[in-house]
């Protein structure tokens, strides 16, 4: 469990470094949030948990984990009907995101990078905080090790404006 908490905090630290960079020049290149999550976590997590993000056609797509076993439409349906509602992001509150979540009620796991829409940062932060609080409440009297993971979860707004959640 401590290894998992440490890995989650390390992922948040890596994300912060990626977003802040080393220079003062403003970078307008779009960021690949799925790749950032992939690179920040252990290979075992990449094998087990898919990372989902919006596709260009308005649907959702995913990489890694079990995503290859789904037809594209089924994958979109699972993301829109099962995973995205867990984050409870208000419609129009973000312009881009990548997330990897456990939908199983026996595990606290969630990593998300969300680019808020103009003026919607607090709405995104509130949604990420609510996800963490839900995980804590679900696990508090159920699975102690998973509660500890949820209790160690973090939400941060990085200097480039993205909201990062690690649970």
PLM regions: where:
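C-terminal motif of bacterial Sec signal peptides marking the signal peptidase cleavage site
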Residues: 17-21
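Alpha-helical transmembrane segments
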Residues: 12-16
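Bacterial N-terminal signal peptides that target proteins for export
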Residues: 1-9
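Soluble, non-membrane globular domain cores that form compact, hydrophobic packing
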Residues: 23-110, 116-167
């Amino acid at each position: 469990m401590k290894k998992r908490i440490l890995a989650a905090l390390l992922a948040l630290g890596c994300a912060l470094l990626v977003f802040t960079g080393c220079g003062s020049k403003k970078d307008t290149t779009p960021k690949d949030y799925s790749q950032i999550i992939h690179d920040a976590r252990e290979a075992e997590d990449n094998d087990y948990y898919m990372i989902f993000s919006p596709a260009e056609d308005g649907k959702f797509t995913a990489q890694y984990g079990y995503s290859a076993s789904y037809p594209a439409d089924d994958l979109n349906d699972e993301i829109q009907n099962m995973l995205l509602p867990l984050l409870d992001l208000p419609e129009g509150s973000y312009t881009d995101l990548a997330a990897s979540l456990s939908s199983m009620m026996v595990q606290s796991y969630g990593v998300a990078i969300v680019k808020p829409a103009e003026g919607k940062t607090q709405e995104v932060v509130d949604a990420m905080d609510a996800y963490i609080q839900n995980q804590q409440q679900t696990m508090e009297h159920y699975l102690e090790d998973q509660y500890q993971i949820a209790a160690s979860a973090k939400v941060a707004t990085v200097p480039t404006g993205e909201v990062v959640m690690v649970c």
